[in-house]
Amino acid sequence: MATSEAPINLTNQFLIAMPGMADPTFSGSVVYLCEHNERGALGLVINRPIDIDMATLFDKIDLKLEIQPVAHQPVYFGGPVQTERGFVLHDPVGIYVSSLAVPGGLEMTTSKDVLEAVANGSGPHRFLLTLGYAGWGAGQLEDELSRNGWLTVQADPEIIFSVPPEERFAAAIRLLGIDISMLSGDAGHA
């Protein structure tokens, strides 16, 4: 009789690209997984700021930014899917029109009301705004994991919100107790 493996659930985990990641879209990336189930996975790259800050983006979408401390906060490349759309990863505070509560973790909101709340100071104090997201179809992420494409570890919101973006990859690796210089992108090699 065949046994079936229980499906893995990587929701609220970091995906850390292995050094040999061939896809330049994800090379050197850390992805926060907002959702992972039998239909696929959805995550946001948390360590790839782009050449636009909050003030510039808010000008483009006609929102008045009343809170100056966030004006120069960078906007991030969240992934290659729907890159014209904003995704806000934030602490689970406030109620917004279109939010996904990540079990045991944060919230991801796609509705403009969270940006309006951030702009006037009533929104979440800790947030990361991305353009686009990373998505995988059913079984696709599991296949990439089996081919040694990613490391996984329980996410730490402090890395997302308190660590500079250029240090997030190394900080996520440290959660595993691994020295990044000792990793090889090839299975079976040190």
UniProtKB/Swiss-Prot annotation:
Domain of life here? Bacteria
Q: Which InterPro entries match?
A: AlgH-like
Instruction: Give GO cellular component annotations, separated by semicolons.
Output: cytosol
> Record's Pfam families?
DUF179 (PF02622)
Family, according to the entry, reads as follows: Belongs to the UPF0301 (AlgH) family.
HAMAP family membership: UPF0301
The protein's name:
UPF0301 protein Rmet_2743
